[in-house]
């Protein structure tokens, strides 16, 4: 418990108080960053082009999410801040999937036209999971989930607007070269990693990427990946589906090994005209919200009651300095709710709504607090009816 509170306290000093935060909103993403409007916009465009590229390559068209279900990306300022936020020295970025809107935390939003930073690869990998799961009716075996995510996450974004998909997964090269090899039978049968289970130090991720890439591009295997997915959808086990779709697994292993020895491999080079994206709006946050955002980021990361109480001190200080900023007051309402102060959360939300009746987060936090109160009310029915108004 002490380590969590200490990490939050450290982060409050690590993030600059005087900042120039921008928020970019697009069809599928919301991006917060203490960076220039130009870089924030380019980063958002890159993410939207990545989404469009996945739609084009897979032939799937995912429904545009509601504003509250978009993926929110927080650029926290640097690798040190990421490590403090994650509570780990070995984290370059991380992603938190949630039904009500997933979140990603990255060091910065400076777009790259070359090889991506590890934190960006993580974001693209996890968003690939998000896209593929949300656009499919059937769950796929783990190797295919991870192999497809690695396949898309090795993307590249040149300045001319192209998107390159299916490039070599250079971040898996050492794993493929030196880690113990996963037999194909094990690759097909391996299930999800369970909490507390020891991680296997083998080339599962690299091998999954290699097999997915091979089955996507090798002419002799054309249609087999789709046949495998159909076998799975029909109820076959992963290993039985593999034998039905791919034939002799020993021959598949030999063919895959030969494929990986090639000097060059294929990939998709997608032109910007076939990857249309929607409008992206970028705005500078108010001075108050710029000061409140580091508090919000720590809160969004997830806090327990003790850590929430420590965060609340900062939230109240910012709100006292900016009492007429509806965004700040809505964030205060969230901090009060996290700390268990339901009446104070409702009061802060009401104050935000009085200033800006369109402030969505204020209504959300007020609703949370009212429903929490209703659970302990003497007349639960009346309390829930009031909360739903």
Name each model-derived stretch:
Residues 14-16:
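N-terminal signal peptide c-region/cleavage motif recognized by signal peptidases
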Residues 19-141, 155-159, 190-202, 234-247:
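Juxtacatalytic substrate-recognition/specificity segment
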Residues 368-389:
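Short coil/linker segments at helix-helix boundaries
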Residues 22, 87, 91-106, 136-282:
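Acidic/His/Gly-enriched intrinsically disordered linker/tail segments
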Residues 117, 138, 201, 308, ...:
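Inter-repeat boundary and helix-capping residues of tandem alpha-helical solenoids
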Residues 222, 226, 253, 309-312, ...:
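Conserved positions within tetratricopeptide repeat
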Residues 23, 234-374:
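Beta/coil-rich, acidic/histidine-enriched accessory regions frequently appended to metallopeptidases
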